[in-house]
Amino acid sequence: HRTLKAGKLDNLDFAKVTRETYGLSGVEYVNQFFKDKAKGMAYLKDMKQRADDHGVTSVLIMCDGEGNLGDADTKKRMQAVENHRKWVDAAKFLGCHSIRVNAAGQGTAEEVAKAATEGLAKLSEYGKTQGMNVIVENHGGHSSNGEWLANVIKNTGMENCGTLPDFGNFCITREEGNWSNCLEEYDRYQGVKDLMPYAKAVSAKAN
């Protein structure tokens, strides 16, 4: 992502570099690198063709910046659901099996869990009509509590709503202004154990 952010790599060349430089056969896209192209069919066709030309499978799209699916404000939460629908459509066109979303929101663990369960269920209902999974990564805050996130996913009651366990992202609270200083961390081994039963992809890390 640093290469993409630095402008040294165009999103359209991602599949080519993945295959030719690293010898890999699958890619996970980040929506931030084609933020205004979710409904741009010419662009999406180009992305799909380039992946196909290099024998690369489009696996999923990681979606950020589209609102909080765990927002306590119903109107804002439903707007977030609506904002994500276009990425479900784009992912389906590209041949992905999932979109990765965040279960973020403000409030107590119980308040955010209730809101996130509703928001994820609503988005997953739409995802189901498109044959698309909606998966949540442990991505800071309440979502980095494995038990909390597993219960949210379970309570949606949707088979296509799952997790994307990140093996190294179980920091619940960080020092303000210092991303590297974790103040509260969930046990990563327990967290992986909590989340794997609902996993439809993983973000594996090793030292």
Language-model segments: which ranges?
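Glycine-/small-residue-rich active-site loops that bind phosphorylated ligands and cofactors
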Residues: G107-T108, G141
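Flexible glycine/acidic-rich beta-alpha junction loops that bind and position SAM and/or redox cofactors
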Residues: R2, G107, G168, I172-N178
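Extracellular glycoside hydrolase catalytic/binding regions
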Residues: V152, C171-Y189, A201, K205
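Structural alpha-helical scaffold elements that stabilize or flank donor/cofactor-binding regions
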Residues: G191-L195
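N-terminal pre-domain/capping segments
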Residues: H1-L94, S98, E110-K114, E118-A121, ...
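Structural motif
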Residues: I61, N102, E137-H139
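Basic- and aromatic-lined ligand-binding clefts that recognize polyanionic substrates
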Residues: G127-N160, F167, I172
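Residue-level signal for the nucleotide or nucleotide-sugar donor/cofactor binding architecture
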Residues: A6-L9, S144, L183, Q190
